[in-house]
Amino acid sequence: MKKYLLVLFLFAAIAVVAQDKLVISHGPYLQHLGETGVTIIWTTNKNAVSWVELAPNDQTEFYLKERPKYYSAEYGFKDVSTVNTIRLSNLTRGTTYRYRIYSQEVLSHEGTKVQYGTVAASDVYRAKPLKFSTTDQSKEKKISFVVVNDIHGHNDLLENLLNKGGYKSADFIIFNGDMVSEMQSEEQMFGSFMDTAISMFASEKPMYYARGNHETRGNFANAFPQYFKSPSGKLYYLLRRGPICFVVLDCGEDKPDSDIEYSGIVAFDQYRDTETDWLRKALKSPVFTDAPFKVVILHMPPFGGWHGEDEMATKFVPLFNEAKVDLMLCGHLHKYIHQKPGNGVDFPVIVNSNTTVVKAKADAESLNLKIINEKGEQVDLIQLKK
């Protein structure tokens, strides 16, 4: 009996140690990839200081020599967090890099004394190092991309649509909102779609995100900006890739702020006023005006009859008409709609369904979008010419 209890105690102790071990719980994944920089994000189960080691994409072993380290740090202090966000800057345009992530647990910090624990890192011994490539606008004459939306935590659907859209050959992926039904916790968010995205592409291929109305719901909703970064530092931004300037907007909620569902905690009308002020200036930027094609990424379409949709129509659409936008890509309605110009909207609006994927390619003279369903069948083809 004593031996049995001893064995049971040892197994329990091992289990506790295993639970206490620092691990990389989610990621890494790429955000805000541009010509000279990228943001790399991952999470750990405990507070840690974190860094990235960077190496050129040559034929040398990663272990050949000490690689330069880039820390998660702000105001001269290394960040201690479970959400590890590292911005790599001053990189070379159009260059492929290999990288490895590290986190070291911080056990205590008293006065000037810091006690550290174990280190967790991505594997570069049994597996090839992760890679990313910076962009080069002067050479990016053609691009291809894939758009999905309204996944609502259905990972099988996400995987199927990405495959049907040919994500492996695409330059980047766009998530156009409602990837979750609500934001409950970090674990729920990653489990709903991001773990799948990371396993498929997001550690090496960039993903750009337009927040939908369902990402604004739940007690974890205000944490969204911690995990998804943009060139503007906001949830709305301009993105120039190849011949396209993408205007990525944040739609906010679809009902009036006073609706009982929000319990008085939201102020999206005011938020969209601020976004409109930003948009008015952004549409005069050379990043936008110099692009052959101008495409809006916005979760809610400017029609449908609800308050949020009406806000899209009254606040954003007049500015887009004046700026001569070529196309708007939306979601939200869970059905496919190809709305041609008219009724006060001077450009086509494509409402992608939750069961279709947009497979797009563009050069300076043409923008082609195939709409493909779950079975891999093409349901529509949109061709824009310059």
Q: What feature does the model see in each segment?
A:
Residues E140-N219:
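Conserved, compact domain cores that house catalytic/ligand-binding motifs in diverse enzymes
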Residues N47, I151-H154, M179-E182, N213-R217, ...:
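Solvent-exposed loop/turn segments at secondary-structure junctions
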Residues V146-N149, F172-D178, K205-N213, V295-H299, ...:
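Active-site neighborhood of phospho(di)ester-bond hydrolases with catalytic His/Asp-centered motifs
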Residues M1-L22:
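Bacterial Sec-dependent N-terminal signal peptides
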Residues K142-I143, D171, Y236, P243-I244, ...:
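Alpha/beta-hydrolase fold active-site loops
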Residues Y102-K131, Q188-K284, K315-N321, I337-I371:
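Extended active-site neighborhood of metal-dependent phosphoesterases/phosphodiesterases
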Residues A18-V146, Y167, D363-K386:
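Acidic, histidine-bearing metal-coordination/catalytic regions of metal-dependent phosphoesterases
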Residues Y262, F268, P286-M328:
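Active-site-proximal segments of metal-dependent phosphoesterases and phosphodiesterases across multiple
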